Amino acid sequence: MAKADVIEVEGKVTETLPNAMFKVELENGAEILAHVSGKIRMHYIKILPGDRVKVEMSPYDLTKGRITFRFK
């Protein structure tokens, strides 16, 4: 039930912040704060500024998100 109301968008990482947080600029121009999902953390996937990523956002708070995929 929780996955049904998730908004998925693509964006570009603009800045790295402490505690595995990132500033991500979305395709529509908005900038949000995103953290790394557990699977990315578990597989030691590095995310650097300039990377294109897929972000999941809750419809209740559109200023925060979770990075779920890093494009090659």
UniProtKB/Swiss-Prot annotation:
InterPro entries reported in the protein's UniProt record: NA-bd_OB-fold, RNA-binding_domain_S1_IF1, S1_domain, TIF_IF1
Localisation: Cytoplasm
Domain S1-like: from-to ranges: 1-72
GO cellular component, one term: cytosol
One Pfam family matching this protein: eIF-1a
PROSITE patterns in alphabetical order: S1_IF1_TYPE
A GO term, aspect molecular function: translation initiation factor activity
Keywords of the record: Cytoplasm, Initiation factor, Protein biosynthesis, RNA-binding, rRNA-binding
Domain of life: Bacteria
Complexes and interactors: Component of the 30S ribosomal translation pre-initiation complex which assembles on the 30S ribosome in the order IF-2 and IF-3, IF-1 and N-formylmethionyl-tRNA(fMet); mRNA recruitment can occur at any time during PIC assembly.
Known role: One of the essential components for the initiation of protein synthesis. Stabilizes the binding of IF-2 and IF-3 on the 30S subunit to which N-formylmethionyl-tRNA(fMet) subsequently binds. Helps modulate mRNA selection, yielding the 30S pre-initiation complex (PIC). Upon addition of the 50S ribosomal subunit IF-1, IF-2 and IF-3 are released leaving the mature 70S translation initiation complex.
Family stated for the protein in its record: Belongs to the IF-1 family.
Name of the protein: Translation initiation factor IF-1
